[in-house]
Amino acid sequence: MAKCNAVAGFNALNGVQLNLFTTDELKAIHYATMEVLMDPGIQVSDPEARQIFKENGCEVNEQTNVVKIPEYLVRRALQLAPSRFVLWGRDKKYNTVQEAGGKVHWTCFGTGVKMCKYQEGKYVTVDSVEQDIADIAKLCDWAENIDYFSLPVSARDIAGQGAQDVHETFTPLTNTAKHFHHIDPVGENVEYYRDIVNAYYGGDEEEARKKPIFSMLLCPTSPLELSVNACQVIIKGARFGMPVNVLSMAMSGGSSPVYLAGTLVTHNAEVLAGITLAQLTVPGAKVWYGSSTTTFDLKKGTAPVGSPELGLISASVAKLAQFYGLPAFVAGTOSDAKIPDNQAGHEKTMTCLLPALAGANTLYGAGMLELGMTFSMEQLVIDNDIIKMTKKALQGVPVNEETLAVESIQKVGIGNNFLALKQTRQLVNYPSDPMLIDRRMFGDWAAAGSKDLAAAAHEKVVDVLKNHVVKPIDADILKDMKAVVDKADKAFRGM
């Protein structure tokens, strides 16, 4: 037959793809954003950041702390920001490429304050502690569809007792060999994070810059403010060579316009202001275009993350990031359910598919429940399957000489089956194959113990925590890393 190389999907991304906007609509959002960056501008609460903006031609009001950012500076920043960078793991097999229009990746949710604990079919919620971070890191190290690790919960047992955020840096880095993304960094402590990473590299700061095993996330304050902490995380991250994620958490109808397009404008202004600051600090600094923006439920008084609007906003942000040539990090695989139940499965699938189909580079939300307040290890294991099936859907239906299978059809002929065909046997792993989601008939399922999905997930959690082995760190290096934590604790306690 005649050769063809048609591939499902279109444009730069292979497979199934969701297109939300025309180029003119993306330009309309951009130009509306440029108007907002000049009027009313961005409130920049950090004096050092205001000085950086001022030295680069921005109008700065020192009475109101408002900075007006002209379009030419934004365009220059977008030209300087890399469209591709690598997140290194302690084990390089976990290295992850973040690239505008590139492959879709997943990470766990962060940062919650409670754990949903499974107890013989019942659930209780308790405050999260440092050991939970270690356990989740180990679970994510095992989970094949979690590409890198984000801080999932707070070490609330350390709060008020020591340098909590520094513990929240050390514990993940030592309990998974995957890249660690700190979702709750403290600007004044970034030097400690740097020192922990440098200690891992034997004091070689240049190697730490070249192979970043650590990155940070910061959130502008909606609407239209960069806090002192956000600015310091951006500035220090850029100076220390750490990838920085500028992620807006606007709430449509609350801290941003009720119209989603208007919310994208304020969201865009906040993120571009942070990205511009990073590039003015260190040209070429690695940055994500981030989003955890959702709606404000005007009837319930909550900010739902399992809503169709969150999926649409995250998909929209992915398209904006591609428009600017930046990697996108967005909320997805999220749920408002309190336990791993039917609601969680429905919401996570919906909020996973929409931004994934739009080509977001990273979706974060795996393991999350209760509007982002709670983390469940059983849910993470279930989400690992949801993500695996989503990845299969993203492949679409490739059409080429091999997949059209004309020779196979002719060989099998009429009324026969393809089970014994060599091609079928060779591709036994071609169909989707979830680990826990059950595809057996009722009788076989009952004979195996009639376990529901959450019970099966709990068994897997217990097995992984008992048997999975994380790549260890050399004892002397580990000692040096821990010494940084001890130093931070002493400083916190005034010793």
UniProtKB/Swiss-Prot annotation:
GO biological process annotation, one example: methanogenesis
GO molecular function: trimethylamine methyltransferase activity
Xref: Pfam families: MTTB
Protein's UniProt keywords contain Ubl conjugation: no
Keywords from the UniProt entry: Methanogenesis, Methyltransferase, Pyrrolysine, Transferase
EC class of the enzyme, as a word: transferase
InterPro entries the UniProt entry points to: MttB-like_sf, MttB_Methanosar, MTTB_MeTrfase
EC number: 2.1.1.250
UniProt pathway: One-carbon metabolism; methanogenesis from trimethylamine
Catalysed reaction, written as an equation: Co(I)-[trimethylamine-specific corrinoid protein] + trimethylamine + H(+) = methyl-Co(III)-[trimethylamine-specific corrinoid protein] + dimethylamine
Subunit structure: Can form a complex with MttC.
UniProt function note: Catalyzes the transfer of a methyl group from trimethylamine to the corrinoid cofactor of MttC.
Similarity comment text for this entry: Belongs to the trimethylamine methyltransferase family.
Protein name: Trimethylamine methyltransferase MttB1
Gene expressing this chain: mttB1
